[in-house]
């Protein structure tokens, strides 16, 4: 028996894994190359990670993953990444960041929401009533209900799309 060179990449399979691989060969599963990491998340947000897995796919779309599963602690990795970013100067430290109380943040969000609602209402008021022409009132109401826009905007969209309900609704819901 010859010796294994120092830099050789050798993996020793246990008996159960060897049997499983033989069965996979018989099932006709195809190996998917290029996958570096596989993670599984349970309901309680516990994460299992497999580094450098061997992944096989069946014809039905199911996957079989071989590798050593380890419990992954994401919060520790996040804290380490933040410390590294602060050390390199990419992210400011906690003392440099201006903090706001939750009440101030909610007040800012409320003011921004009121400003956008008022601006939209002013736009509709400035234009006045738009002539519906030969458009069906039921079509106009349907567009208003589906997109939560004003009647004037619904009429404009229907006119722009020659009375086509689907295209008018799609253009307003973007």
UniProtKB/Swiss-Prot annotation:
Principal cellular location given in the protein's record: cytoplasm
Residue list for modification N-acetylserine: 2
Regions annotated as coiled coil: none
SUPFAM superfamilies for this protein: UBA-like
Record-linked InterPro entries: EGD2/NACA0like, NAC-like_UBA, NAC_A/B_dom_sf, Nas_poly-pep-assoc_cplx_dom, UBA-like_sf
Subunit-level organization: Part of the nascent polypeptide-associated complex (NAC), consisting of EGD2 and either EGD1 or BTT1. NAC associates with ribosomes via EGD1 or BTT1, and with the CCR4-NOT complex.
Processing and modification events after translation: Ubiquitinated by the NOT4 E3 ligase and the UBC4 E2 ubiquitin conjugation enzyme.
CDD domains, sorted: NAC_NACA (cd22054), UBA_NAC_like (cd14278)
Annotated region (Disordered), positions in chain: 85-137
Protein species of origin: Saccharomyces cerevisiae (strain ATCC 204508 / S288c)
Further information: Present with 38016 molecules/cell in log phase SD medium.
Keyword Cytoplasm: yes
Skewed-composition ranges (Low complexity): 111-120
Keyword check for Chloroplast: no
Keywords attached to this entry: Acetylation, Cytoplasm, Nucleus, Phosphoprotein, Protein transport, Transport, Ubl conjugation
Biased composition (Acidic residues): 121-132
Domain NAC-A/B: 15-73
GO (cellular component) term, any one: nucleus
Gene3D superfamilies (UniProt xref): DNA helicase RuvA subunit, C-terminal domain, Nascent polypeptide-associated complex domain
Protein name: Nascent polypeptide-associated complex subunit alpha
GO MF entries: phosphatidic acid binding; phosphatidylinositol-3,5-bisphosphate binding; phosphatidylinositol-3-phosphate binding; phosphatidylinositol-4-phosphate binding; unfolded protein binding
């Amino acid at each position: 028996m010859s010796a294994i060179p120092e830099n050789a990449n050798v993996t020793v399979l246990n008996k159960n894994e060897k049997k499983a691989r033989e069965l996979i060969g018989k099932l006709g599963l195809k190996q998917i190359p290029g996958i570096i990491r596989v993670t599984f998340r349970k309901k309680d947000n516990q994460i299992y990670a497999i580094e450098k897995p061997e992944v096989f796919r069946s014809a039905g779309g199911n996957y079989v993953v071989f590798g050593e599963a380890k419990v992954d602690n994401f919060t520790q990795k996040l804290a380490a990444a933040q410390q590294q970013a602060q050390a390199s100067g990419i992210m400011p430290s906690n003392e440099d960041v201006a903090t706001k109380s939750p009440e101030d943040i909610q007040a800012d969000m409320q003011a921004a929401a009121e400003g956008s609602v008022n601006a939209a209402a002013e736009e509709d008021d400035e234009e006045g009533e738009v002539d519906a022409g030969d458009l069906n009132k039921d079509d106009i109401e349907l567009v208003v209900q589906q997109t939560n826009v004003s009647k004037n905007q619904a009429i404009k969209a229907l006119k722009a799309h020659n009375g086509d309900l689907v295209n008018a609704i799609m253009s307003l819901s973007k």
